[in-house]
């Protein structure tokens, strides 16, 4: 059984990293339903924090589908930006500016370059859509940051 079987997936891509449509393409055939997908400019938002509209969307979709059924996939270009977004959907908005301030959703959250995502999707499609970005992103730093956030704040340890 895949990590994505029957899950409602929220995709937050990055203009300078991995865009939403690339991750959507990878998820086809995984049993996941993409319920929201956007491509943001992570460095454009205040201090790299998650866009307030996206925070509201994540909160609303989590209320609708229940936290155990929701998975967030990020495409941030930098480990720090990925970490801030991951912290926002697990422990609440660390900048205390948005709708998720103080809201601990504890959602499953992964970056598109992490093995949990990469191993769950079609390898050929992944290579076409994301493979090139692996060469320019600091994959090890992103994996470490995401893992740390999940271990510290994630409610679901599967």
From Swiss-Prot:
It catalyses: acetyl phosphate + [thioredoxin]-disulfide + NH4(+) + H2O = [thioredoxin]-dithiol + glycine + phosphate + H(+); acetyl phosphate + methylamine + [thioredoxin]-disulfide + H2O = sarcosine + [thioredoxin]-dithiol + phosphate + H(+); acetyl phosphate + trimethylamine + [thioredoxin]-disulfide + H2O = glycine betaine + [thioredoxin]-dithiol + phosphate + H(+). The active site is at 44. GO terms for molecular function: betaine reductase activity; glycine reductase activity; sarcosine reductase activity. InterPro entries: GRDA. Its EC number is 1.21.4.2, 1.21.4.3, 1.21.4.4. One of its GO terms (cellular component) is glycine reductase complex. Monomer. Component of the glycine, sarcosine and betaine reductase complexes, together with components B and C. The keyword ATP-binding does not apply. Belongs to the GrdA family. In the first step of glycine, betaine and sarcosine reductases, the substrate is bound to component PB via a Schiff base intermediate. Then the PB-activated substrate is nucleophilically attacked by the selenol anion of component PA to transform it to a carboxymethylated selenoether and the respective amine. By action of component PC, acetyl phosphate is formed, leaving component PA in its oxidized state. Finally component PA becomes reduced by the thioredoxin system to start a new catalytic cycle of reductive deamination. This is Glycine/sarcosine/betaine reductase complex component A. It comes from Alkaliphilus metalliredigens (strain QYMF). Keywords: Oxidoreductase, Selenocysteine. It holds the Pfam family GRDA.
């Amino acid at each position: 059984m895949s990590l994505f079987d029957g899950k409602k997936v929220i995709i937050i891509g990055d203009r300078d990293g991995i865009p939403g449509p690339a991750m959507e393409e990878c998820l086809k055939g995984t049993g996941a339903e993409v319920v929201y997908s956007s491509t943001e400019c992570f460095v454009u938002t205040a201090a790299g924090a998650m866009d307030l509209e996206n925070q509201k969307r994540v909160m609303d979709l989590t209320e609708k589908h229940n936290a155990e059924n929701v998975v967030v996939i990020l495409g941030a270009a930098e480990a720090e930006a990925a970490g801030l977004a991951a912290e926002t959907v697990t422990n609440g908005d660390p900048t205390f500016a948005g709708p998720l301030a103080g809201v601990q959703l504890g959602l499953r959250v992964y970056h598109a370059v992490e093995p949990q995502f990469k191993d769950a999707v079609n390898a050929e499609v992944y290579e076409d859509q994301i493979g090139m970005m692996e060469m320019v992103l600091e994959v090890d730093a992103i994996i470490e940051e995401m893992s740390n956030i999940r271990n510290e704040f994630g409610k679901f340890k599967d």
